[in-house]
Amino acid sequence: MHTVLGHHSRVAYAEIHDDETAATAIGVLRRAVAWFAARGVTTQRVLSDNGSCYRSHAWRDACTELGIKPKRTRPYRPQTNGKIERFHRTLADGWAFQRLYSSESARRKALPAWLHGYNHHRPHTAIGKTPPISRLTNLAGQYN
C-alpha cells in the first residue's frame, strides 16, 4: 500500500501495489501529484519514511523533475510522520479490517469507495469535524 496525505487538508490518495520499489513509488508519486493538482493542490514537499525506494537517486530525481522537495523522517521516530501513521490506523480500521471480504480482490476493489467516503463524507476531528475535501478551496465549481 502506498499512501499520500495532504498536510493541510488531510485528503488521502492511496494505491495498492505488491512491491515497494523506487519505480513503483515514483509512479505513485506522479499519479498522486496529478490527482492533487486536479483538485487545485500544488505539491511542494513530500515527507517519506526511510524505505530504500525513498533513499534512491531515482526518487530524488523524480522529485526534482516534479519541482518537489523530498524530506525523510528521522529513523525510528514514527511521530515525525504522525498524520500518515494515524491515517494508516484509520485505513486499517475503516477499510482493511472493517468487514470480512470474500477475497483479497474484493478487499482491493473496496478501497476507492472507502477513500471517497473518507475524503468527502467522514468528519475529521483534527480539522473541525469536517470532511478533508472541504479544506480544498480551489475546487472547480465550488462557489457556483
Regions found by a protein language model. Give the residues of each.
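Active-site beta-loop-alpha junctions of metal-dependent nucleic acid enzymes
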Residues: 15-39
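Acidic/histidine-rich, metal-coordinating catalytic segments
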Residues: 20, 38-56, 76, 130-133
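Short glycine-rich loop/turn motifs
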Residues: 1-3
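RNase H-like polynucleotidyl transferase catalytic core
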Residues: 45-50, 65-83, 100-102
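C-terminal domain-tail junction helix/linker
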Residues: 66-68, 89-144
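Short, acidic, Ser/Thr-enriched surface-loop or helix-capping motifs
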Residues: 6-7
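Distinct, well-ordered alpha-helical segments
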Residues: 59-60
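Short small-residue beta-strand/loop micro-motif enriched in glycine and branched aliphatics
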Residues: 11-15, 71-73, 97
